[in-house]
Regions:
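Non-catalytic, polymerase-adjacent accessory regions of viral genome-replication enzymes
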Residues: 1-49
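Generic non-transmembrane alpha-helix signal with a bias for helix starts/N-cap capping motifs
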Residues: 12, 57-58
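Catalytic-core region of right-hand nucleic acid polymerases
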Residues: 49, 61, 65-191
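Amphipathic alpha-helical protein-protein interaction segments
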Residues: 50-54
């Protein structure tokens, strides 16, 4: 986020500036996971799709680390971090494109245990088509005809940093890589 965000005359400017300075916090509603739960999640590991695309996972994570989006550490180096939670990594093949990595934060209850801190009015997941059609139908005709333009922004990201103490909550167990210890990927920002 650009440092000049604080000077923008908008009600969200102070909030966005705080996120710029401190990162996004991730609060959980449950006690830290005991070591045996973390170990079980590590052993459960990632989705089989990630292991099937092991070379892609390795290259993609190396690229993400180079760009400062993720950090990859040996599990042993972070195993005792009190906020560490592990989610499985998946890899979705896409027709005529390279695969896409996904993190399943629902599998080990990370989503369920995460406190929703964002403003509720910003959380408009689902029913996108219905919302768009409603807006089109109820547009003010005084402004002329309504046009719709669909733009694919899947490769455009606004990366906002995570609060340093929150990043381990969203960690991912990487698939076993030959000759390497168990590895964990920790996001440094949210896409």
């Amino acid at each position: 986020i650009n440092p000049s965000i604080a000077s923008i005359p908008h009600v969200a400017a102070p909030y966005l500036d705080r996120l710029r300075r401190h990162g996004i916090p991730v609060a959980t509603s449950t006690a830290p996971w005991p070591p045996m739960v973390r170990q079980a999640c590590l052993l459960r590991n990632s989705h089989p799709s990630a292991a099937e695309h092991l070379d892609f996972v390795r290259d993609e994570m190396a690229d993400f680390c180079e760009k400062g989006f993720w950090a990859v550490l040996p599990y042993a180096a972070i195993a005792h971090h009190p906020r560490l939670r592990l989610s499985p990594l998946g890899c979705i093949p896409q027709r005529d494109r390279r695969p896409r990595l996904i993190t399943n934060l629902t599998f080990n209850a990370v989503n369920a245990e995460t406190v929703r801190l964002g403003p509720s009015e910003a959380m408009q997941f689902g029913r996108a088509l219905q919302r768009i059609l409603f807006r089109l139908r109820h547009a003010n005709p005084a402004f002329g005809p309504t046009y719709l333009c669909k733009i694919d922004i899947s490769d455009g990201f606004y990366r906002i940093g995570l609060a340093a103490d929150s990043a381990p909550v969203l960690a991912v167990a990487l698939p076993p890589m030959p000759g390497e210890p168990a590895l964990v990927a920790i996001p440094l920002s949210l896409p």
